[in-house]
Amino acid sequence: TFRSNLGTNYAFYRKQDFEGASSIDRLGQNSTSLSKIKSSEKSFVNWDNIISYNKTVKDHTFGATALTSWTQSKYTSVNAQGEGQLVDSYLWHNLGANDKSSYVIGSDYIQHQTFSYALRFNYSYKGRYMLTVSNRWDGDSRLSKGNKWASFPSVAAAWRISDEAFLKNVEALSNLKLRLSWGKTGNSGIMAYGTQSGLTPKTNSAFQDNGYTYYIYNEYVGNENVGWEMSNTWDLGFDIGLFNNRISAVVDLYQTKTTDILLPRTLPTSMGGSNATPFKMYQNIGATMNRGIEVSVNTVNVDNKNFKWNSTLTFAANHEEITDLIDGKDIIGAESSITSSLLIGRPLRSYHYFINQGIWQENEAEEAAKYFKDAKKTQSFKPGDIKLQDLDGNFIIDDNDRTYLGSQSPKWTDRKSVV
């Protein structure tokens, strides 16, 4: 069989605004009017082509599937504004009537594409023993030449134990299946053009009266060496059904090792910045390990033609830790100074900051004065300042007193539902 699916999402936005010279919005703006227009278009196209073949020979079932998938995301925008038009009734319909020295014009275009193809082979014997082997090749235009493509193989096997003769007489058992799988997955999720350095033109500047345009570096510095983040996952699970599946459960134990973690990293301020903001760069920054358990239990409490009542409980526990980083060193403030440090042996996006012990009080002025905010001991603490714990005991509160405070990753989650 052959199937082709084409889907698209499209959004159009347009905003027109006029603020008269005497309006509240223009108070303190030299009594001039403001006219502006902004419009944008966003589109997403997905085209999948799938061909499949299935064949049964006695107790043996074979299947093969091949597919291609193409996506394109596109965003365009344009905006223009001016100040000082003398006829309010023009509103935003005649931007050329504004003072030419006030013109601000901007536009943007962002586009990226992905292309994938995959092969999958299935085999089943009596629906009791099952094997699936597949491979997927993905390409992403956001990555640089030589790093755009990656391959993701996988293999999965299952054994429906409840179909074996030695369990046929266990009436309470409706289903029992053991599953084992291994596979690779990837992540190329960087911003469009994230591997390239660029410039942003500025025309709304003090030099505009003289017809000058200036440029600043983009916040993100290009890195052509960025490649796919790769994850290897082992999963061991079983499905069980009891009493004609009135009670069923799914349990999975997994371990995922990820290499070449793809994250934006805030660079040292010594390297400069853009618009008073430190530069950032996408990097394959290290490796992590995740392992955990997921359990889902479902019960059919009432099931008749007039009423049905199901209950579901899910529970998941996960341990995550960074196993390696660039140069083998922690990266403090990888994305922000407090909430996104990368610490070996800790989860991703850890909190690394001072321990807050409250506020220095008036009756603690003498004690507060023993602690200093700088290495030269010229600025001591005083009542009203935040009391930070001095971990190294040198009476100087500095970066050496920051410590691990936790992470954004929960140790466990659960959910209950009744329908």
What residue spans do the PLM features occupy?
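Conserved small/polar residues in nucleotide/adenosyl-binding loops
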Residues: 418
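Extracellular/periplasmic, surface-exposed regions of secreted and cell-surface proteins
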Residues: 1-19, 29-346
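Conserved small-residue
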Residues: 79, 283, 300-414
